[in-house]
Design a protein with these regions (language model features):
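A structural boundary/capping signal
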Residues: 2-202
Length: 202
């Protein structure tokens, strides 16, 4: 089974005996990026598909998985190291973005199908290279985050893709090759997840 290695840690006990306290490798949920269902410009559905895949192949790990929406009131969030970015730093200003997190213990892996970073990437490296710091940004570009458990996201998320259509009904970007994701309660609730108002819970 593929896994992600973690640096070894050697600790000396009071007895003077050196004990190896190496953490066990983290299960690599997706062996390679190309194995994942991916449609450019539909990050919310890409992540939903990752959650669905885990619920089928590694159902016991779903409790350790989370979905993170990134946005703000002005819908302008700068992210670096994005495949759609231009020039050397690969900067993109999205209206929103979405990530998949896996936290089996005190370690955390980020799966971002739109990033040029390794797949997956440890959280600290991902945050450092993708978000950098708000100190260099104007307030309208500050990033806010909504974190949802993968199981709840699977159960409640719905999108009829209306946000990807122009007023004449044509597509801004080609849609995925499968039917829209629906829930029993709502045909479309994407805006509820993107909304960063802390008083409104998805």
């Amino acid at each position: 089974m593929a896994s992600v290695s973690h640096p070894s840690k050697i600790q000396r006990q009071d007895t003077g005996v050196v004990t190896n306290t190496t953490k066990k490798p983290i299960l690599n949920l997706f062996s390679q990026r190309s194995d994942c269902k991916y449609t450019p410009a539909y990050c919310e559905e890409n992540v939903w598909k990752l959650c669905q895949d885990i619920s089928t192949r590694h159902s016991g790990e779903l409790q350790h998985c989370y979905v993170v929406f990134v946005s703000n009131d002005s819908r302008t969030v700068p992210l670096w190291r994005q495949k759609a970015g231009k020039e050397e730093e690969k900067l993109v200003i999205w209206d929103y973005h979405e990530l998949f997190l896996y936290t089996p213990d005190d370690r955390c892996l980020v799966y971002d199908l739109d990033s040029e970073l390794p797949y997956p990437t440890y959280l600290h490296k991902y945050v450092t290279e993708t978000f950098r710091t708000d100190h260099i940004l104007k307030p309208e570009y500050f990033r806010y985050f909504r974190v949802i458990s993968a199981s709840l996201f699977l159960q409640h998320f719905a999108s009829d893709r209306r946000h990807m259509k122009r007023s004449d009904g044509s597509w801004i970007k080609p849609p995925p090759d499968y039917p829209p994701i629906t829930s029993a309660a709502n045909p479309h609730n994407l805006d509820d997840f993107i909304n960063m108002d802390p008083t409104k819970v998805s």
